[in-house]
Amino acid sequence: MDLRQIRDVYIDDGLDFQNATARTCRDVVLTLISASRMADHVTVKGGVVMQQISGDRRRATRDIDLDFVRYPMTDEGIRAFIRTLCPADVDVRLEIVGPIDDLKHQGYHGKRVHLRVTDSTGTSMETKLDLGVHDKLPLEQLELWFDTALQDEGVALMANSKEQVCAEKLRSLMRIGAASTRFKDVFDVYYLLCREGVDADALDRAMRVLVYDADDMRENSPADAYARLSRVLNDRRFLRNLSNARNNWLGANVDKVVTGILRHFG
């Protein structure tokens, strides 16, 4: 395995240096998970799932978001997880760099791991793992094939459904409101709802678990969600930030994005 060669392929494909490095590390980590017994204890989420679903290099992501399933979220558990991914016969090493950080924001509790990936030639690259716990058992995890430069056919791992991804991004937007800085999430939601398409019943189930029936949310119905999202998405300052080309990975018309999202709840 030659990390530099893999990164160069992604650069030739149009990614900048940082995103090519992140994608190379992503490929290594997902491939190692799929080949290990930890594949049954991990589900992939966040930007990595969005990147795969969209197949669009503009939807870049720097971190790797994972949830543990029936596995302890402790520092020792995390270190054992990383060790398990690298048996002696694998020609790449993973090393945790520095302390494991606690992540706590808006009711979310997780861990951040700074990871160094080193190949047999001594080339090293660094990435971040953001780890959580899959505790919403009614939300079924689905098998998703991830493209990777290390396997021609890709690798299969459990992942959040696109309906869960959509509902979690909407939950965050409603919870934080117009003060949210996660503008890319708005375009993710629009892509899932209006371009990729979602199963209406599956989205309703995900919204019910994550929003309507959640003790820490005020929105109890699609009508409540519509009212809250309408206030947030039509806030003038929020709209200005949405219009920033850096946030708009789709290059979509912002008014069309807002209208498209609200149409699903109105």
What are these regions (language model features)?
Residues 44-48:
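Glycine-rich beta-strand-to-loop/alpha-helix junction loops that act as flexible
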